[in-house]
A protein has these predicted regions:
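Acidic-basic catalytic patches of nuclease active cores, encompassing PD-(D/E)XK
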Residues: 1-42
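Non-catalytic C-terminal interaction segments of nucleic acid-processing enzymes
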Residues: 4, 31-34, 38, 98-100, ...
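Short amphipathic alpha-helical segments and helix-helix/interface helices
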Residues: 29, 78-82
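Alpha-helix C-cap/termination motif
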Residues: 35, 53, 84-88
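Active-site-adjacent loop/helix micro-motif of nuclease/hydrolase catalytic cores
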Residues: 41-42, 67-79
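Beta-rich catalytic cores
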Residues: 46
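Conserved catalytic cores of phosphodiester-cleaving nucleases, focusing on short active-site segments
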Residues: 50-67
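Nucleic-acid nuclease catalytic cores
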Residues: 85-112
């Protein structure tokens, strides 16, 4: 991630407080749409955070962001992810912490591999990362943040929903 992108995310974090995670999730959804995924659904409230079709496969993402250098997985998170694996989906954890030089980690979820109730740095997720998928969004995410961070700061979730509506592959749950 470019230094400028980190700086813009820091501005976003300072401006919106607790809404930061949901806004970054929407920015990630927009970045995926920029890479021409199919049938992307973004959920801001309950259930799967992002669900999309990539190369004909159903892929689901639990998005974890943090204002610190770690994230926390809850038992509820893992139970839901376990069910999705059983249903045959490709399941990922999309992790972005606020540690210096951190970038998105898109880690394939493997049941039993991640502890709950602990603060986890990005390190444990690295063993399961999908580098091809990460490469797919890196440039797009920088571009999306550059273009849409002002909308996120000034118009919040409703503003980013307006951006999402401009993509034919987007759908709301």
């Amino acid at each position: 991630m470019k230094h400028e992108t980190h700086a813009k995310l820091a501005r976003l974090r300072a401006a919106v407080g607790r809404e930061y995670g949901k806004l970054v999730q929407k920015l990630l959804a927009i970045a995926f749409l920029e890479t021409e995924v199919q049938k992307l659904v973004e959920r801001s409230t309950q259930g799967i955070d992002l669900e999309m079709e990539i190369a004909g496969e159903r892929c689901v993402f639990e998005v974890k962001t943090s204002e610190s250098d770690s994230v926390r997985l809850t038992p509820k998170d893992l139970e839901g992810l376990d069910r999705l694996v059983e249903d045959g989906a490709r399941v990922y954890l999309a992790v972005l912490t606020n540690a210096p030089f951190d970038d998105w980690i898109l880690a394939r979820y493997v049941p039993g591999e991640f502890p709950t109730g602990k603060n986890l740095t990005s390190f444990p997720f690295r063993a399961h990362r999908d580098r091809d998928l990460e490469q797919r969004i890196f440039t797009a995410f920088d571009r999306v943040v550059d273009r849409d961070v002002h909308t996120a700061i000034t118009r919040r979730q409703g503003g980013l929903d307006g951006v999402l509506q401009g993509y034919p592959a987007w759908g709301r749950a």
